Amino acid sequence: MAAKDVVFGDSARSKMVEGVNILANAVKVTLGPKGRNVVLERSFGGPTVTKDGVSVAKEIELKDKLQNMGAQMVKEVASKTSDNAGDGTTTATVLAQSIVREGMKYVASGMNPMDLKRGIDKAVAAAVEELKKISKPCTTNKEIAQVGSISANSDTSIGDRIAEAMDKVGKEGVITVEDGKSLADELDVVEGMQFDRGYLSPYFINNPEKQVAVLDNPFVLLHDKKVSNIRDLLPVLEQVAKAGRPLLIIAEDIEGEALATLVVNNIRGILKTVAVKAPGFGDRRKAMLEDIAILTGGQVIAEETGLTLEKATLAELGQAKRIEVGKENTTIIDGAGEAVNIEARVKQVRAQIEEATSDYDREKLQERVAKLAGGVAVIKVGAATEVEMKEKKARVEDALHATRAAVEEGIVAGGGVALIRARTAIAALTGANADQNAGIKIVLRAMEEPLRQIVTNGGEEASVVVAAVAAGTGNYGYNAATGEYVDMVEAGVVDPTKVTRTALQNAASVAGLLLTTDAAVAELPKEDAPMPGGMPGGMGGMGMDM
């Protein structure tokens, strides 16, 4: 095990605070509508230009071990806020820096760090309650567009695209972001359920122009095993042929004789069928087959449920108004499932989302809810260059997270105004002793900081603006984009309550840990040993008999 350097007290804290300041100073220049850009070096290709706080934070790694520990703790604030609320990373970093800076003054003057932390926690809890009180629900398309625009650094086209997407697929629908092929942003909406499996043979295509197989009013056969013997399928095929309707078969795989027979029947026009592999793998495949069954009003033919292919009847098959099968995707439109059953299934999957531990599982479950409840929208981001595309795509993703947060918990006045208003709940607070009161004061001062930074980045005098905004009431604030004092909500400058709340809570949590740190342990830098000398010269013939 490598030797460690142990540093105590002020020496440890001051070094860590230096790291906090280096990271925060690089991140906070991006805050607000007039925030500046930061250029990030890439080991391959050109540099990335960004105004996204968390992207800047993630790039920072400092040489000094203690400074780096401080920087990493604040990086945690940014990434945690980004994970929970999807935005507010720069605000969280600015708040954390301010709480640490003010707190260090009190710690240096001999106050008890634990009591300071208790005061900070008490103030933050009161501020969060106040934010919830002043929050208003975000329901209209206009409000959703405003939240998206602000989060995307005042880009109204992004906000409008997101609002349009949410309008089409509903609040629960899946909205994904992809690279576009043109200069303009585009929105593609897929109604119904789509999964990423296409036809098993191009001979199933019946619409050569679009290269898709279209089935109108088809039956849907769902099976969880491989099908290779046509005898297994014959009873069902005969019943479907009598009904005179097309058939979509979704199974683990369809191969050999079974696939060949289906293709021949299709070409001859005897029976219109399309065979598709089941989506997903393992347990997720079973769950998705069950989803499709509920959506189409059918049953999965599986041994576990006591059903076999040979004995399957039309009653076990699902139905839909229309199904389109492409090379890579299958879309089921207007399944015949009962609305009550679909709702019950959505509830069940939502309960699993609550219990999910990994982000990946949560994302996949969320996709399943969307496919059952609404549809899928794809925002294709257009830009002139690769660098611009990356930067814009990151902003669209941020804005998307922010709008979801706004729909979830509502909105408050943006531009740092909500935090100024929430200070009223803290002003009357008192702690158990003078040190706790100092902790409350630290938070009071920190809650001005986002507004100060927004104004500073806009090139104005921060103290004057903070005093003017604090003297006002309600949504009265300073719109840095226009340099005017306005009603922030009417002007469309709003923040999701969840973003503001999460930023404050995460900042206070990490800053409190830093203030109560009294020792730091870091690995000593390794000294590289000098290279050993070369091999000695040849030994020559030593006259040894072999």
From Swiss-Prot:
Entry GO terms, CC: cytoplasm
Keywords: ATP-binding, Chaperone, Cytoplasm, Isomerase, Nucleotide-binding
InterPro entries, per the entry: Chaperonin_Cpn60_CS, Cpn60/GroEL, Cpn60/GroEL/TCP-1, GroEL-like_apical_dom_sf, GROEL-like_equatorial_sf, TCP-1-like_intermed_sf
GO function terms (MF aspect): ATP binding; ATP-dependent protein folding chaperone; isomerase activity; unfolded protein binding
CDD domains listed in its UniProt record: GroEL (cd03344)
Biological processes, Gene Ontology terms: protein refolding
Reactions it catalyzes: ATP + H2O + a folded polypeptide = ADP + phosphate + an unfolded polypeptide
PROSITE patterns in the cross-refs: CHAPERONINS_CPN60
Record has Cytoplasm as a keyword: yes
Subcellular locations according to the entry: Cytoplasm
Annotated Gly residues bias: 534-546
Keyword field contains Cytoplasm: yes
A Pfam family matched in the record: Cpn60_TCP1
Region feature (Disordered): 526-546
Binding site for ATP: 30-33, 51, 87-91, 415, 479-481, 495
Principal subcellular localization: cytoplasm
Enzyme nomenclature, EC number: 5.6.1.7
PANTHER family named in the record: 60 KDA HEAT SHOCK PROTEIN, MITOCHONDRIAL
Function: Together with its co-chaperonin GroES, plays an essential role in assisting protein folding. The GroEL-GroES system forms a nano-cage that allows encapsulation of the non-native substrate proteins and provides a physical environment optimized to promote and accelerate protein folding.
Subunit structure and binding partners: Forms a cylinder of 14 subunits composed of two heptameric rings stacked back-to-back. Interacts with the co-chaperonin GroES.
The family this protein is said to belong to: Belongs to the chaperonin (HSP60) family.
Name of this protein: Chaperonin GroEL 2
Organism: Burkholderia lata (strain ATCC 17760 / DSM 23089 / LMG 22485 / NCIMB 9086 / R18194 / 383)
